C-alpha cells in the first residue's frame, strides 16, 4: 500500500503530478472523495495542518474525524499496532502529526488505510508540496528547475526540502550553524538522487553564500515544538542567521521568501522582510489545502488499483 511518510518514496513524476493536480483543484474544485473518511491523529498542536486536512476532505465530499493523543488509548499505553489495526479498518485515510517518526512507521505497517505524515521530527512533506505549488505560481521554476536556499535549522523542513530538491533536480543551498549537522543517511540519499537528476546541492555555514543568486529563500522557526526549554541556547547558536534586508539583497532581485509558519519576527526573519513577503507566505499557507486535496485523491486512486 502506498503511504505518504516521506517524499523519498515518491518519484519526480509523482511529485510534479501532485503539484499540478493541486493547481487544477485550486482553479476548479471537485467532489472526488464522496463519503470518504479521514482520521486525523495529533500528538502536537496544529493550526494550518489541521485546517488544511479537515477542509480538504470536506470540500472533496468526505468527512474528518479529529483525534488528539488524549482521546486515544495510546495515551494509556495501548500499542501503536493495535490502534492502527482498529482505526485503519474503519476509515479511508489516516493523517498523523507525531512526536516520533517511528510511530508513523509502526502505524503504517499495520494500517489497512494509507497513512499520511503531517509532521514528524524528521520530515514535513505536505508543507514542501505546498511550497512547490507556491513556487510554481510565482513563476520561480524555470525549465523545471528552481534555485532555492534554506537558511536555519537542520530540521524536518530542511530534510524534506533537501530530499525534494535532489529528486527534482533543483539548485539547492543550505546554511546552518557550525555545530549543526544534516543526517548522514538523508544526505547520502540526496547525493545519490542528485547524480540521477542533476541537482546541484551545497551545504555551508554562511547564509550569504547560500543566498547568492537564489530565486526562493526558505526559513523556519529556530525553536521547534518540544524544544521550548532549549530556546535560549538555540537563539544564541543561530545568531547571524536572520533573514533581513541585507540577507535578501544577496538573493536575486525578485526572490520570494517562504516560511511554513508560525513565524517569530526578530529571530529567523525580520518584521520588515516578513511583511514585505506576507502575500507569498500566506498564499503558501493557503496552498496546503490544495496539495492535501491532490494527495488524498492520489492515495485513493493508488488504493483503488491494488
Swiss-Prot record:
L-ornithine binds at residues 156, 220, 224-225. SUPFAM superfamilies: Aspartate/ornithine carbamoyltransferase. Gene3D superfamilies: Aspartate/ornithine carbamoyltransferase. The keyword Protein transport does not apply. InterPro entries: Asp/Orn_carbamoyltranf_P-bd, Asp/Orn_carbamoylTrfase, Asp/Orn_carbamoylTrfase_sf, Asp_carbamoyltransf_Asp/Orn-bd, Orn/put_carbamltrans, OTCase_ArgI. Reversibly catalyzes the transfer of the carbamoyl group from carbamoyl phosphate (CP) to the N(epsilon) atom of ornithine (ORN) to produce L-citrulline. This is Ornithine carbamoyltransferase.
Amino acid at each position: 500500500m502506498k503511504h505518504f511518510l516521506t517524499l523519498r518514496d515518491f518519484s519526480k513524476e509523482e511529485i510534479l503530478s501532485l503539484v499540478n493536480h493541486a493547481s487544477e483543484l485550486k482553479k476548479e474544485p471537485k467532489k472526488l472523495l464522496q463519503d470518504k473518511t479521514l482520521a486525523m491523529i495529533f500528538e502536537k498542536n496544529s493550526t494550518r495542518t489541521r485546517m488544511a486536512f479537515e477542509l480538504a476532505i470536506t470540500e472533496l465530499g468526505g468527512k474528518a474525524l479529529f483525534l488528539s493523543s488524549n482521546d486515544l488509548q495510546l495515551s494509556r499505553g495501548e500499542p501503536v499496532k493495535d490502534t492502527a489495526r482498529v482505526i485503519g479498518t474503519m476509515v479511508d485515510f489516516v493523517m498523523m502529526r507525531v512526536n516520533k517518526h517511528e510511530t508513523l512507521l509502526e502505524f503504517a505497517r499495520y494500517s489497512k488505510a494509507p497513512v499520511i505524515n503531517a509532521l514528524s521530527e524528521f520530515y514535513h512533506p505536505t508543507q514542501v508540496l505546498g511550497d512547490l505549488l507556491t513556487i510554481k505560481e510565482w513563476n520561480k521554476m524555470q525549465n523545471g528547475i528552481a534555485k532555492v536556499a534554506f537558511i536555519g535549522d537542520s530540521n524536518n523542513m530542511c530534510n524534506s526540502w533537501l530530499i525534494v530538491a535532489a529528486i527534482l533536480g533543483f539548485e539547492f543551498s543550505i546554511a546552518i550553524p557550525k555545530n549543526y549537522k544534516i543526517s548522514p543517511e538523508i544526505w547520502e540519499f540526496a547525493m545519490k538522487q542528485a547524480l540521477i537528476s542533476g541537482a546541484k546541492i551545497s551545504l555551508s555555514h554562511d547564509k550569504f553564500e547560500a543566498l547568492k543568486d537564489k530565486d526562493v529563500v526558505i526559513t523556519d522557526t529556530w525553536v521547534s515544538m518540544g524544544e521550548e526549554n532549549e530556546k535560549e541556547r538555540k537563539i544564541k547558536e543561530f545568531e547571524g542567521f536572520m533573514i533581513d534586508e541585507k540577507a535578501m539583497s544577496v538573493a536575486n532581485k525578485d526572490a520570494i521568501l517562504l516560511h511554513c509558519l508560525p513565524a517569530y519576527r526578530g529571530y529567523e526573519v525580520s518584521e520588515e522582510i516578513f511583511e514585505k513577503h506576507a502575500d507569498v507566505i500566506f498564499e503558501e499557507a493557503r496552498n496546503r489545502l490544495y496539495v492535501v486535496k491532490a494527495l488524498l485523491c492520489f492515495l485513493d486512486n493508488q488504493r483503488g488499483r491494488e
